[in-house]
Amino acid sequence: MSEQFQHVSVLLHESIDGLAIKPDGIYIDGTFGRGGHSRQILSRLGENGRLYSIDRDPQAIAEAKTITDPRFNIIHGPFSGLKGYVEELGLVGQIDGVLLDLGVSSPQLDDADRGFSFMKDGPLDMRMDPTSGMPVSQWLLTADVEDITWVIREFGEDKHAWRIAKGIVAYRDNEENEPLTRTGQLAKLISDVAPKNFKEKKHPATRTFQAFRIYINSELDEIDTALNGALDVFAEGGRLSVISFHSLEDRMVKHFIRKESRGPQVPHGIPLTENQIKALGSAKMKPIGKAIKPTVNEVDVNVRSRSSVLRIAERL
């Protein structure tokens, strides 16, 4: 791996500590990336421990194949398939920990050819797996103003969503313009249509690029499916350790842990028999500590860690 595409794992020790590694345990790293968390898990496992890592990025799979440790296996696919992979392995109810490091990795951002960054010109792609699905440039060929506005507002939480969407469609529909196929084009277009008094510290294109990436990769659906899948495969006492990088992700994780730690909520005044109450079940998880954020030192070393949040929970 070239120096340009090196990846510094965020909240590395805190997230692995949160898994409370058992030497002979079975663990899943749902987001292999460049293997920082996976290698740390392996360093804490005994000779009978096992680690199954997952990633849908072919470049991540290539990196994973350089690991020859017999305790390690890599699965090429989205982490939303976690439950299915565990079922195929016959390990339901035996998983001692699941780690999810959400969002886009530094190597993906730094590689202009992947199209994730507005800071570097490249193909307007943004797919986590470039071998499947639709690149952003293809989606923008036919998406209307309402659809684009909804995506930017829903996944980018940008108050200028309508203005940006109108600018994109106006540019696209002008036959004198070059096709919108490059990240540099999109970043400039957004800067041009942003209000002249735009005062945010971030680049005007930040939220739109985030929104398009989340949408094109169905990231929030992936997270929801993975969290619920993990719940179904844990052994008693199994740990969930999740690192989020923006408010949409963190809210999902926070609400999931809260919901599963409260158990079924029955409205007051509804008469239930003892058997009916038992059938509803009880809380399935408990939160471990409070949300953890990177230290000042970590942010100084790796500025991309500044927005990260780690949440840990345990299966009951």
Swiss-Prot record:
Family that this chain belongs to: Belongs to the methyltransferase superfamily. RsmH family.
Alphabetic keyword roster: Cytoplasm, Methyltransferase, rRNA processing, S-adenosyl-L-methionine, Transferase
GO molecular function: rRNA (cytosine-N4-)-methyltransferase activity
GO biological process: rRNA base methylation
UniProt protein name: Ribosomal RNA small subunit methyltransferase H
Superkingdom: Bacteria
Chain sites annotated for binding S-adenosyl-L-methionine: G35, G36, H37, D55, F79, D101, Q108
Reactions this protein catalyses: cytidine(1402) in 16S rRNA + S-adenosyl-L-methionine = N(4)-methylcytidine(1402) in 16S rRNA + S-adenosyl-L-homocysteine + H(+)
Predominant location: cytoplasm
GO CC aspect terms: cytoplasm
The enzyme's E.C. designation: 2.1.1.199
